A protein has these predicted regions:
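Conserved N-terminal structural module of periplasmic/extracytoplasmic solute-binding proteins
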Residues: 1-67, 83, 126, 297, ...
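Short helix-initiation/N-cap motifs at beta->coil->alpha
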Residues: 38-47, 132-136, 220-234
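Hinge/lid segment of periplasmic solute-binding proteins
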Residues: 63-119, 138-140, 262-264
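Conserved C-terminal helix/tail region of periplasmic/extracytoplasmic solute-binding proteins
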Residues: 148, 313-314, 326-335, 342-396
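Extracytoplasmic/periplasmic substrate-recognition and gating elements
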Residues: 28-29, 33, 119, 254-321
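A local structural motif
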Residues: 5, 29-39, 56, 122-129, ...
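Extracytoplasmic/periplasmic solute-binding protein
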Residues: 100-104, 136-190
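Glycine-centered hinge/linker elements that transmit conformational signals in sensory
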Residues: 142, 182-222
Length: 396
């Protein structure tokens, strides 16, 4: 129907140009008018809350998991869509057994490595699958130091990286499922779990201590600069950076075509549940369809649009080639061209991704990120950090 118009609220502002071009193409192809606005200044949650208050609500909203949970009563049930069976349900946002959020992209985190730099400095072939334990990692770090790379590691000081990404792996890697993570934090809350006695905590923190020791910003770790870290790994001044595939945005402008990069799981001594074989990640943005302010024709047009993204060549091209995203759907065989995305795509295809634990309080990464910053800066002991984390959860 030529009169149908759908609106989309994009909350990944780095993709706004691609979205606008897509909207134009889509209208030419289908006759459906698509208008894309972008969140500026506000968090996605703040922006969409204001829009629901004013009644100016987009047909499709791109949100984080907590936004979809908050808007559950207005979100269309997508469980019966054709794409649900090929990654939609597995990676989508499911609330009370109903699929409410379409998984827009897969992101995962681990140790980013510069394979080319490692091989040049050590004179040996680098195979990340052979670096499994903390001791394996120490051995390669020492080789790099001996070869002249004085500080082979970068650690971000940002609270989201420390509290939102490194610490949450302790939850996610209890057994690789969101349920296992939930049981673990419930155990901290009721006092039945003590971090100091937990193998995964000790294992990941032993590796963290090692990364701290070889950190290029060791002398002043809380003054580390994210962009400097990105440049250092890209140009081969360092070998390893704890981060995720989103970092390609900062790395790409400095990358040389003949340099090989990838992401590997965090090496650690506790290999239970294949923790050293898996990246932690999952969908990081979801598309939901509003049923309160958008009429049935708009809702159907929005469903058609999501179907087109998954099954139409132009839709697939938008996700993978234009936006450089790792798709959640197994029918899409386009290969992501950026090397970090390619790593994550391979782990996804091999089903070696541990679920992101999303059921975290809104202040988790800020509050516990600040405690992790103290530990990174040697301003507290591991026991004091354990006590801070336990007391945070017991207050929830």
């Amino acid at each position: 129907d030529d009169n149908t118009k759908i609106t989309i609220l994009n909350t990944k502002d780095e993709l706004q140009t691609q979205w606008e071009e897509l909207a134009e193409e889509y209208e030419k192809t289908t006759g459906v008018k698509v208008e894309v606005s972008v969140t500026v200044g506000d968090s996605p949650s703040e922006d969409i809350t204001k829009r629901y208050a004013s009644g100016e609500v987009p047909t499709i909203f791109m949100g984080d998991v907590q936004d979809i949970l908050m808007l559950d009563e207005y979100a269309m049930d997508l469980s019966d869509e054709e794409w649900a069976d090929i990654g939609g349900t597995k990676f989508g946002c499911v609330v009370n057994d109903k699929l409410k959020g379409f998984p827009f992209c897969i992101e995962a985190r681990g140790l980013i490595y510069n394979k080319t730099a490692i091989e040049e400095v050590t004179g040996e072939e680098f195979d990340p699958s052979q670096i499994k334990t903390t001791d394996d990692l120490k051995a390669i770090l020492d080789k790099l130091v001996d070869g002249g790379m004085e500080t082979p590691v970068a650690l971000n000081m940002e609270d989201w990286s420390l509290g939102g990404h490194y610490l949450t792996q302790v939850y996610e890697e209890q057994d690789g499922t969101a349920k296992g993570a939930q049981d673990f934090v419930d155990g901290i809350k009721d006092g039945s779990v003590k971090l100091g006695d937990n193998d995964r905590w000790n294992s990941l923190m032993d590796t963290f201590d090692l990364l701290k020791e070889y950190n290029m910003n060791k002398d002043n770790p809380l003054a580390s600069d994210y962009d400097e870290n990105a440049i250092s790994i890209t140009e081969g001044d360092i070998a390893f950076w704890f981060n995720g595939n989103w970092a390609w945005a900062e790395m790409s402008e400095f990358a040389e075509d003949d340099t090989e990069y990838g992401i590997m799981p965090i090496p650690q001594n506790d290999a239970d549940n294949d923790a050293t074989e898996n990246l932690c990640g999952g969908a990081t943005k979801y598309l939901m369809i509003d049923t309160k302010y958008n009429d049935e024709k708009q809702q159907q047009a929005a469903k058609d649009f999501l179907h087109w993204l998954v099954y139409d060549e132009d839709g697939q091209d938008f996700l993978v080639n234009k936006c450089n995203l790792v798709p959640a759907f197994s029918n899409i065989d386009l290969e992501v061209t950026n090397p970090l995305g390619a790593s994550v795509q391979k782990y996804t295809a091999d089903e070696k991704i541990f679920e992101t634990f999303a059921n975290l309080p809104g202040d988790h990464w800020k509050t516990l990120g600040a405690e992790m910053q103290k530990y990174l800066g040697d301003q507290c002991t591991r026991e004091e950090l354990e006590a801070s984390i336990e007391s945070y959860w017991q207050k929830q």
